[in-house]
């Protein structure tokens, strides 16, 4: 599909950097995403984790799409990042949101130094017009979840400035990933992901983002692909 691989095929540079001890990496994942294995208790979560680069790097993740919505968060350092037609330099506390059809790359061409977190949730969509199906362990009240879904579907702003609560949440996610043994932290991770989505809703509502319903219609899917 227009020559762009899904993430599963493009994470080889990361795996290689880890094997060369260039970078600290820890993740919980399923399918072909790298990391310790997630259990069925977090079904719908495809990857959650971080990397921490404390020396200059010689690799990057080329253009790719994810099988799910991805939230990135940079705790420290700086990170060249591109999404669709925008090139950015992410700074500490920057958060990015990538929908499954949005092509993006990390590094230009190499990644920066710093600590970088991500979470990928599979919502069973690959195109903008499809309805989002959240995992059944996402427990936001229906009105809140609908509000969050609509905001995420009807705007395409790439980068947000996160607050200390979001930083705290990602730091707790990092600790939960580190100490997980074969799914032992599944409940903790479920709660942290729910908390993150609630904090994200707060952030998006405060920012009063401009919504555009046209971003959800099927002609847009055709236009993109």
Q: Where are each of the predicted segments found?
A:
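A hydrophobic/aromatic-rich effector-binding and dimerization subdomain
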Residues: 1-20, 25-49, 105-179, 206
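N-terminal regulatory/effector-sensing and dimerization cores
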Residues: 47-144, 182-183
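A general structural signal marking secondary-structure boundaries and capping sites
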Residues: 100, 177-181, 200, 204-207
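A generic fold-level signal
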Residues: 40-43, 66, 90, 111-113, ...
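Pocket-edge positions in alpha/beta enzyme catalytic cores
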Residues: 63, 158, 213-217
